[in-house]
C-alpha cells in the first residue's frame, strides 16, 4: 500500500510520497531520518501548494487548528483521490477525521504515534525536501504566521480580560494576610502603653483609627472619639485610659506606632476598593457564575484554572473538586473515597446545606456552574443586552437550586456566606457595629448592704414514706350540711394510730435483727432484699459474703449438671433395654 505524508508548513501544503511502503513499521526509522540525506532517501516531494499571502496563510492555518478542511487542501488531496490502495499520514487526528469525511475519499488515514519520528525529521529538514525554499525565508514566514495566529486567537476585547480577575483575587488574598499581620503588630506594640484597649475593642481597623486619633492615653480627656466609636464604648475607653496599668512611652515610639497604624487604615480602605472592583469585573465577565457561587468563589475558580476559557472547557466533575487536587490524588493512591468538593465548598448554597446534603448540593451546583461558564465564555451578546439578560441563566438556576435545597432540608433558607438574591444581585452586607466585649463584673462579688452573710444551715429535705389512704366507707351517709358524723372521724383517727404503732413495731424488729447480724438497718434491708441473709434454727440472722454466694451458685450449677448427666444415662439405658426387647420379639416371630 502506497504511503503519502501530508505536511502543513507556514509556506504552504506539502504532499510527500514514501519510497518504502512499510516505512512506518521500520525499527531504524529514527536513526535513518536523523540527517538530511537520510530523509531524502526515505521520502520525495509529490506536490507543493504555496500560500499566496500572509492573510491566506492565516486563514488556512486557523481552519486547520479547528479541524476543518479548506478548499485549497481539498484540491491538493484530489491528486491522490483516484489512486488505489493508498494510505495518508496526518499529524493531527482531528484533521484526519475531517479528511475521512470528504465525499469520494477512500483513503486509509494514519494519525497515531507511529508517525511521530517521520514528521519530526520532515520538519527539521524541510528546506532540503522542497526546492527553492531557503531556511531564512522559512523561519521568517513561521514567525510572522505565529504572530498573526496569536492575534487571531486572542480576539481582544476589554470586557473579556479575565487576567484582571486573576490578579485582583490574588492581591485580595495577599492584602488580607498583610492586614492581619500589621494589625496584630499594632495591638502588641500599643498594648504596652494601653493594654486594656485590646479587651474593649475587637475590630482591628477601629483600633488603628483610635491609636491615630488619641495618641498618648493621657489625651483621653481632649480626644473626640465619636467618629470612631459609639457613645457607650467611648465612655468605656476613656474610663479605662484614666486608670490604665500600661507603661509610659516616648513621643518617638508613638510616632512609629502611628505610622504602622496608618498603614493598617490605608490597607483596609484599599481592600474595600479592590473588593468593589472585583465584584464589578466578575459581574461583567462571568455574570452567570457570579449569580451561582458569588464573586469571590467564582474569581478563585477562574484563577485556579488560569482563565475563563479554560474553566469553561472543564466538566462539572472537575469544577466540583477544583482546588482539592492533593486530596484527590492521595485518595486515588490509597484507594480511599475521593473528595466531594474543593473551592466550590465556600459557596453560600453549599454552606446552607447540612452535612448529609452538602455533597449532593456540590454536585448539582457544579453542573449548573459549568453550563453558566460556557454561556459566559462563548456567548455573544448584542449591544442592547442588559446585565439581567446576560445573567438570566445563572439567576434562574440559583432560584431552582434554592427551592431544591429547601425541599431537601425541609426548612426555609437562611442567608449565609456570599449572599446573592434571586435576581442575581449581591445583597449588601449589614452596617458594621462595634459591640462592647463582656468584662468581669467585680460588683457581683460584694455583699448586699453592710450585713454579713447569713450562716444559717439549709434544712435538708426529709424523706416521707408514702402512707396508704384509707378507703371511705360507702355506708356513711353525709349530713344535710355536707359534713359527716363525728363517729366516722373518730374511727379514722383510731385506724391511723394503729398503723403508726404497727410501723414502729416493724422498725424496732428490723433494728434488733440488724444488731444481731452486725449490720446497719440500711445494709440489712439491702442484703435481705438480695437474699444475702440466712437464719439459723433459733431464728438468728447472719450475713453471707459475695464470695460465699458465688461458691454456692457454682456448687448448685455443678449439682444440676450432674443430675442432668445421670438422667441422660438412665434414659440411654432404658432406650438400650427397649431395643434389645424389640430384637428378641423379632427373632421369636421369625422362628
Swiss-Prot record:
Residue span(s) of domain Nop: 285-410
SUPFAM superfamilies: Nop domain
Bias kind Basic and acidic residues: ranges: 453-462, 476-486, 505-515, 557-571
Compositional bias segments (type: Acidic residues): 463-475
Coiled-coil annotated residue ranges, if any: none
GO molecular function: snoRNA binding; snRNA binding
Gene Ontology biological process: box C/D sno(s)RNA 3'-end processing; endonucleolytic cleavage in 5'-ETS of tricistronic rRNA transcript (SSU-rRNA, 5.8S rRNA, LSU-rRNA); endonucleolytic cleavage in ITS1 to separate SSU-rRNA from 5.8S rRNA and LSU-rRNA from tricistronic rRNA transcript (SSU-rRNA, 5.8S rRNA, LSU-rRNA); endonucleolytic cleavage to generate mature 5'-end of SSU-rRNA from (SSU-rRNA, 5.8S rRNA, LSU-rRNA); protein localization to nucleolus; snoRNA guided rRNA 2'-O-methylation
Any one cellular-component term (Gene Ontology): small-subunit processome
Sorted UniProt keywords: Nucleus, Ribonucleoprotein, Ribosome biogenesis, rRNA processing
Biased composition (Basic residues): 581-591
Region (Disordered): 437-591
Any Pfam family the entry gives: NOP5NT
Location within or outside the cell: Nucleus, Nucleolus
Top-level taxon of the source organism: Eukaryota
Family classification: Belongs to the NOP5/NOP56 family.
Function recorded in the entry: Required for pre-18S rRNA processing. May bind microtubules.
Protein name from the UniProt record: Nucleolar protein 58
Organism: Aspergillus fumigatus (strain ATCC MYA-4609 / CBS 101355 / FGSC A1100 / Af293) (Neosartorya fumigata)
Amino acid at each position: 500500500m502506497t504511503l503519502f505524508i501530508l505536511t502543513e508548513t507556514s509556506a504552504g501544503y506539502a504532499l510527500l510520497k514514501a519510497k518504502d511502503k512499510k516505512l512506518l513499521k521500520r525499527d531504524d526509522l529514527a536513526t535513518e531520518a536523523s540527517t538530511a540525506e537520510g530523509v531524502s532517501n526515505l521520502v520525495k516531494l509529490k506536490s507543493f501548494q504555496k500560500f499566496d499571502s500572509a492573510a491566506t496563510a492565516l486563514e488556512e492555518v486557523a481552519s486547520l487548528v479547528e479541524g476543518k478542511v479548506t478548499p485549497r487542501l481539498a484540491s491538493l488531496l484530489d491528486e491522490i483521490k483516484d489512486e488505489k490502495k493508498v494510505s495518508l499520514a496526518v499529524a493531527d487526528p482531528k484533521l484526519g477525521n475531517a479528511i475521512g469525511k470528504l465525499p469520494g475519499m477512500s483513503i486509509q488515514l494514519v494519525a497515531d504515534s507511529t508517525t511521530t519520528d517521520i514528521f519530526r525529521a520532515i520538519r527539521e529538514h524541510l528546506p532540503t525536501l522542497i526546492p527553492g525554499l531557503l531556511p531564512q525565508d522559512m523561519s521568517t514566514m513561521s514567525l510572522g504566521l505565529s504572530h498573526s495566529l496569536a492575534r487571531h486567537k486572542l480576539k481582544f476585547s476589554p470586557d473579556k480580560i479575565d487576567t484582571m480577575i486573576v490578579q485582583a483575587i490574588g492581591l485580595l488574598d495577599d492584602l488580607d494576610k498583610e492586614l492581619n499581620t500589621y494589625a496584630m503588630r499594632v495591638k502588641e506594640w500599643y498594648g504596652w502603653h494601653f493594654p486594656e484597649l485590646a479587651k474593649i475593642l475587637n475590630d482591628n481597623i477601629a483600633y488603628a483609627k483610635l491609636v491615630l486619633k488619641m495618641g498618648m492615653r493621657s489625651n483621653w480627656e481632649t480626644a473626640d472619639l465619636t467618629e470612631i466609636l459609639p457613645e457607650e464604648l467611648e465612655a468605656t475607653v476613656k474610663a479605662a485610659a484614666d486608670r490604665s496599668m500600661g507603661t509610659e512611652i516616648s513621643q518617638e515610639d508613638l510616632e512609629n506606632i502611628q505610622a504602622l497604624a496608618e498603614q493598617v487604615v490605608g490597607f483596609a480602605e484599599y481592600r474595600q476598593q479592590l473588593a468593589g472592583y472585583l465584584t464589578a469585573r466578575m459581574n461583567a465577565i462571568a455574570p452567570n457564575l457570579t449569580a451561582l457561587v458569588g464573586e469571590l468563589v467564582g474569581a478563585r475558580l477562574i484563577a485556579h484554572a488560569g482563565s475563563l476559557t479554560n474553566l469553561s472547557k472543564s466538566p462539572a466533575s472537575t469544577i466540583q473538586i477544583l482546588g482539592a487536587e492533593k486530596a484527590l490524588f492521595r485518595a486515588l493512591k490509597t484507594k480511599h473515597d475521593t473528595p466531594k468538593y474543593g473551592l466550590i465548598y465556600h459557596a453560600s448554597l453549599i454552606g446552607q446545606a447540612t452535612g448529609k446534603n452538602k455533597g449532593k448540593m456540590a454536585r448539582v451546583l457544579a453542573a449548573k456552574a459549568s453550563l453558566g461558564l460556557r454561556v459566559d465564555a462563548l456567548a455573544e451578546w448584542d449591544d442592547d443586552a442588559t446585565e439581567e439578560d446576560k445573567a438570566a441563566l445563572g439567576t434562574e438556576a440559583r432560584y431552582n437550586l434554592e427551592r431544591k435545597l429547601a425541599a431537601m432540608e425541609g426548612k426555609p433558607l437562611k442567608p449565609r456566606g456570599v449572599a446573592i438574591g434571586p435576581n442575581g444581585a449581591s445583597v449588601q452586607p449589614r452596617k458594621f457595629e462595634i459591640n462592647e466585649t463582656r468584662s468581669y463584673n467585680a460588683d457581683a462579688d460584694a455583699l448586699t448592704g453592710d450585713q454579713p452573710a447569713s450562716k444559717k444551715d439549709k434544712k435538708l429535705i426529709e424523706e416521707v414514706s408514702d402512707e396508704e389512704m384509707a378507703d371511705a366507707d360507702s355506708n356513711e351517709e353525709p349530713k344535710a350540711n355536707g359534713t359527716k358524723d363525728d363517729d366516722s372521724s373518730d374511727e379514722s383517727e383510731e385506724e391511723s394510730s394503729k398503723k403508726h404503732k404497727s410501723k414502729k413495731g416493724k422498725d424496732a424488729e428490723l433494728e434488733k435483727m440488724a444488731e444481731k447480724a452486725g449490720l446497719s438497718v440500711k445494709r440489712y434491708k439491702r442484703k435481705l432484699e438480695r437474699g444475702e441473709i440466712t437464719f439459723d434454727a433459733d431464728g438468728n440472722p447472719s450475713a453471707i459474703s459475695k464470695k460465699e454466694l458465688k461458691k454456692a451458685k457454682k456448687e448448685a450449677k455443678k449439682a444440676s449438671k450432674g443430675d442432668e448427666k445421670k438422667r441422660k444415662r438412665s434414659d440411654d439405658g432404658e432406650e438400650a433395654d427397649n431395643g434389645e426387647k424389640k430384637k428378641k420379639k423379632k427373632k421369636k416371630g421369625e422362628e
